[in-house]
């Protein structure tokens, strides 16, 4: 066996349908499209979602919800995430570098989920009452 002798297995390849090439092929004249009608014509097919003139499903259903303009800009950080950070002074830049908030985030808030056992200094971040109490109980402080 050589590379120039390799061939696909018998029956693995199918010949392309050659339509409109005479009556003897079985696919001559109308090329398997039948007679007349929209689907027999070139370019003759409806657009996606078209239901023959009936009001389409997408337009029958009501609009719902809205797009929040502040979604990407306010981040949430857990106490358990702050525990894992290697730095003691925590601000928005430190959170971005650690990947805890997105690059587009403009402000962040600390929430009281998890535990904090070490002393940290929080600069320029918001915190819930529970989170503030937990940080101060661990010996930490807030610098505005």
From Swiss-Prot:
Q: Name one GO biological process term.
A: translation
Q: Which domain of life is it from?
A: Bacteria
Q: Which PANTHER family match?
A: 50S RIBOSOMAL PROTEIN L15, LARGE RIBOSOMAL SUBUNIT PROTEIN UL15M
Q: What does this protein do?
A: Binds to the 23S rRNA.
How does the record describe its quaternary structure? Part of the 50S ribosomal subunit.
Family, according to the entry, reads as follows: Belongs to the universal ribosomal protein uL15 family.
The protein depicted here goes by the name Large ribosomal subunit protein uL15
Source species: Burkholderia cenocepacia (strain HI2424)
